[in-house]
């Protein structure tokens, strides 16, 4: 029988990527190169009084081709840190501003 040799190294088991967050919001600024500022809205019911409370936060997102403009409704996906404050990237423009 011939002596069979295996690979010189064992490839590391591929880890599945974690679920990435997605968000939909409106572009409020496009004055930076390849970056847009998107306002994300969250609505929650107050635990005691039941009133719907609107909270907003602004996030910076990477727009490689500079396609999005102010007022556009866009879809974002979380990604690795691209700069000190940029952690999202533009997936698609859902609706252009009128």
Curated annotation (Swiss-Prot):
GO terms, molecular function: rRNA binding; structural constituent of ribosome
Keyword rRNA-binding: yes
Covalent cross-link site, Isoglutamyl lysine isopeptide (Lys-Gln) (interchain with Q-Cter in protein Pup): 96
Pfam name, any one: Ribosomal_S17
Residue ranges of the region described as Disordered: 1-21
GO process annotations (BP): translation
Assembly information from the UniProt record: Part of the 30S ribosomal subunit.
Job description of the protein: One of the primary rRNA binding proteins, it binds specifically to the 5'-end of 16S ribosomal RNA.
Protein's name in the database: Small ribosomal subunit protein uS17
Natural source organism: Mycolicibacterium smegmatis (strain ATCC 700084 / mc(2)155)
GN (gene name): rpsQ
């Amino acid at each position: 029988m011939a002596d069979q040799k295996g690979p010189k190294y064992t490839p590391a088991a591929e880890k599945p990527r974690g679920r990435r967050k997605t968000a939909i919001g409106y572009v409020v600024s496009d004055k930076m190169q390849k970056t847009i500022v998107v306002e994300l809205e969250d609505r929650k019911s107050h635990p005691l009084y039941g009133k719907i409370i609107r909270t907003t936060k602004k996030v910076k997102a990477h727009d490689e081709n500079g396609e999005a403009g102010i007022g556009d409704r866009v879809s974002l996906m979380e990604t690795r840190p691209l700069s000190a404050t940029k952690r999202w990237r533009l997936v698609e423009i859902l609706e252009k501003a009128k």
